[in-house]
């Protein structure tokens, strides 16, 4: 864009309501926001700079459970606990029977020093409880259910409204900071025992497996860590973690726990790119090196930013100290319009601390009794040792991910499943056409389940609008002290929080999933077949409403299928299974296996997508020897129930136009009998086109 075009842009904006929003920014940022995205190719190759800012210890629901148009507190299809209540009703062993998410009763909550909670391998696997997700209070304490809202963290919310938020982004491992950062920087935690692994905590003993920056270095892709050196990026300086929380890197440059970096000498790539930085104790600011590189046009192709402790958002530090820090990063990146037009900034969090999130993470089955997978689960199961229980390496709970770039403006939500290795996969997607940058440590299972983040972008026709972000100058720390923790008290009267009203534009997803159920007459068992005709792998979790075992995990790669069976010998021939999948996908199957053996009706339902139009068809059939009356209802909209009388051997197609619900569906087919036949299919028909968030999300 020429200088004259930039002036025209700003002149036109001044004549609209957007002018007030533009005035929130310094002149250099207003100029930068007038620059359109680099569109040299209209593809991911237009991204020339990838910047990753990984903050600390917040869960998705803790920050964004009330945000408009994401899968938060208003989720219409949350996981059901074994007691039949939703996962939001977390059991309490002492005191009230349960605890719901609550907003702490404190003024200016975004500036409060909210307490830190347990967040290690043992307590996180304890809360996860083999996928039942019902022991958060016992393992984390009551503050686990505390959340923030827009008035508390307005900068975070308006970043989400201005750019793109990912509401299915998980931390990589249900454990602490270092293991999750090892996933970001290396692709695993030494799961195969190489180089001193596996590492499940913050031992920082010195490791030897390969890291991704080394892969980039060997390939010729430029990279750098932006940080402050504190009192020294060496053992004497605790690798950047100092007693002064306003300098250093809080020890968050986890590359420095690898021997190849510890032993690197000045002048070597590993030293110069990972063990240098600002020195604010001697003068200057935390952002001088970043600002200089942006100004000079020398921002690397890939870079990571590590904040000092006070700005990391790690409890007990205030969330809004982090907001101030993030704005300074944005100011630096947008100070050179040409650089910003080619830059993608990913803002995420290493782990959830001890804060609750309601979406049960995908996990690999630990054994045949726990499920099946079409892709190898090698490297995804920890066998246990003297101090750590056995369990899957991941995924962990959801954490926030904001994708801030010229290609992600507009307030979108992307609901594909991601984790920290998705960052490595994005770098691969960008540079693999010219460089050998495949991350060697990322397991096949993780590559199947976790996407590469490209679905969050619109490279072909990016949004040319400007974001509206609040000023964060009031969030700069008023002192340089540490403060005692604020410990909130749960309210005596509880109620479920409601999300902000309204829909959110949603990116197209690569999913096309089917779960088919039928009674296996040869075994008398109930059989589920998981079929994936989409372009990405998917993880399913199956729970039972009438038995105490489970849940079971199933992973199905793109264009593959698998099946499993459940006996009803101990449940009076009754089966009651619910399948959970990505982006609100749910299937429920209830009935009696005796229907296939006697003279009764034996109904079944399958479904098919009309992808071109975003609609769905149910096929109702009766394989039994008696007639059956089935009623079909749709939870979206006000359509009257449809009633069908099926004779033995009859089939009926039931077509549903989903335009009014933006291709979302929640269809139930029932014979009306207590504990009788029920099929329920819910989710979104993906058409390859953008859509909206789930209209059934409960809002205020």
From Swiss-Prot:
Predicted to be exported by the Tat system. The position of the signal peptide cleavage has not been experimentally proven. GO terms for molecular function: phosphatidylcholine phospholipase C activity. Its EC number is 3.1.4.3. Belongs to the bacterial phospholipase C family. InterPro entries: Alkaline_phosphatase_core_sf, PC-PLC, Phosphoesterase, PLipase_C_C, TAT_signal, TAT_signal_bac_arc. The lineage of its organism: Bacteria, Pseudomonadati, Pseudomonadota, Betaproteobacteria, Burkholderiales. Residues 1-34 form the signal peptide. This is Non-hemolytic phospholipase C. It catalyses: a 1,2-diacyl-sn-glycero-3-phosphocholine + H2O = phosphocholine + a 1,2-diacyl-sn-glycerol + H(+). It is an enzyme of class 3 (hydrolase). GO terms for biological process: lipid catabolic process. Hydrolyzes phosphatidylserine as well as phosphatidylcholine. It holds the Pfam family PLipase_C_C. It comes from the Bacteria. The gene is plcN. Disulfide bonds: none annotated. Keywords: Hydrolase, Signal.
């Amino acid at each position: 864009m020429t200088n004259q075009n930039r002036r025209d842009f700003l002149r036109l904006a001044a004549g609209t309501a957007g002018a007030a929003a533009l005035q929130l920014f310094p002149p250099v940022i207003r100029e930068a926001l007038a620059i359109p995205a680099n569109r040299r190719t209209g593809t991911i190759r237009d991204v020339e700079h990838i910047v990753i800012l990984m903050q600390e210890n917040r869960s998705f629901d803790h920050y964004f459970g009330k945000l408009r148009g994401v899968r938060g507190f208003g989720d219409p299809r949350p996981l059901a606990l074994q007691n039949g209540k939703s996962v939001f009703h977390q059991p309490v062993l002492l005191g009230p029977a349960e605890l719901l998410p609550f907003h702490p009763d404190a003024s200016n909550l975004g500036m409060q020093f909210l307490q830190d909670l347990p967040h290690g391998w043992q307590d996180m696997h304890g809360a996860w409880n083999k996928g039942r997700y019902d022991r958060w209070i016992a393992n984390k304490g009551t503050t686990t259910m505390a959340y923030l809202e827009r008035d508390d963290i307005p900068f975070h919310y308006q970043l989400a409204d201005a750019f793109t938020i990912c509401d299915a982004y998980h931390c990589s491992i249900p454990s602490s900071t270092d293991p999750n950062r090892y996933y970001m920087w290396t692709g695993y935690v030494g799961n195969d025992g190489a180089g001193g692994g596996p590492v499940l905590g913050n031992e920082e003993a010195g490791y030897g497996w390969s890291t991704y920056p080394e892969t980039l270095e060997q390939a010729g892709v430029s990279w750098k860590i932006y940080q402050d050196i504190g009192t020294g990026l060496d053992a004497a300086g605790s690798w950047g973690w100092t007693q002064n929380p306003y300098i250093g890197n809080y020890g968050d440059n986890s590359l420095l726990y690898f021997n190849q970096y510890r032993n690197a000498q000045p002048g070597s790539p590993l030293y110069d790119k990972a063990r240098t930085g600002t020195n604010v104790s001697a003068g200057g600011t935390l952002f001088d090196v970043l600002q200089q590189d942006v100004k000079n046009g020398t921002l690397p192709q890939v870079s990571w930013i590590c904040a000092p402790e006070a700005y990391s958002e790690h409890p007990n530090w205030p969330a809004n100290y982090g907001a101030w820090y993030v704005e300074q990063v944005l100011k630096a990146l947008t100070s050179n319009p040409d650089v910003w037009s080619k830059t993608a900034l990913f803002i995420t969090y290493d782990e959830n601390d001890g804060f609750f999130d309601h979406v049960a993470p995908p996990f690999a089955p630990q054994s045949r009794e726990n499920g099946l997978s079409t892709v190898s689960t090698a490297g995804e199961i920890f066998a246990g040792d003297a101090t750590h229980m056995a369990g899957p390496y991941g995924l962990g709970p959801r954490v926030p991910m904001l994708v801030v770039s010229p290609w992600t403006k507009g307030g979108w939500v992307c609901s594909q499943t991601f984790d920290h290795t998705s960052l490595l996969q994005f770098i691969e997607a960008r540079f693999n056409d010219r460089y050998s940058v495949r991350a060697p440590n990322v397991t096949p299972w993780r590559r199947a389940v976790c996407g590469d983040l490209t679905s969050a972008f619109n490279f072909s026709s990016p949004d040319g609008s400007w974001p509206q972000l609040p000023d964060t100058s009031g969030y700069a720390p008023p002192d340089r002290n540490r403060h005692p923790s604020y410990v909130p008290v749960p309210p005596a009267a509880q109620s479920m929080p409601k999300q902000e009203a309204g829909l959110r534009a949603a990116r197209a997803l690569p999913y096309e999933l089917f779960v088919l159920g039928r009674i296996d007459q040869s075994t008398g068992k109930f059989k589920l077949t998981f079929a994936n005709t989409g372009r990405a792998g998917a993880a399913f979790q199956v729970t039972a409403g009438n038995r105490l075992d489970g849940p079971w995990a199933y992973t199905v790669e793109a264009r593959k299928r698998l099946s499993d069976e459940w006996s009803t010998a101990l449940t009076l021939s009754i089966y009651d299974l619910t399948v959970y999948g990505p982006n609100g996908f749910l299937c429920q199957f209830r009935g009696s296996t005796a229907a296939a053996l006697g003279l009764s009706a034996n109904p079944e339902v399958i479904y098919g997508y009309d992808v071109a139009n975003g609609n769905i068809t149910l096929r109702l059939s009766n394989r039994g020897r008696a007639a059956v009356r089935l009623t079909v209802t749709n939870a979206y909209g006000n359509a009257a129930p449809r009633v069908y009388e099926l004779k033995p051997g009859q089939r009926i197609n039931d077509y549903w136009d989903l335009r009014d619900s933006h291709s979302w569906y929640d269809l139930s087919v029932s014979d009306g009998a207590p504990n009788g036949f029920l099929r329920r299919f819910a989710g979104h028909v993906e058409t390859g086109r953008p859509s909206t968030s789930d209209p059934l999300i409960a809002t205020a």
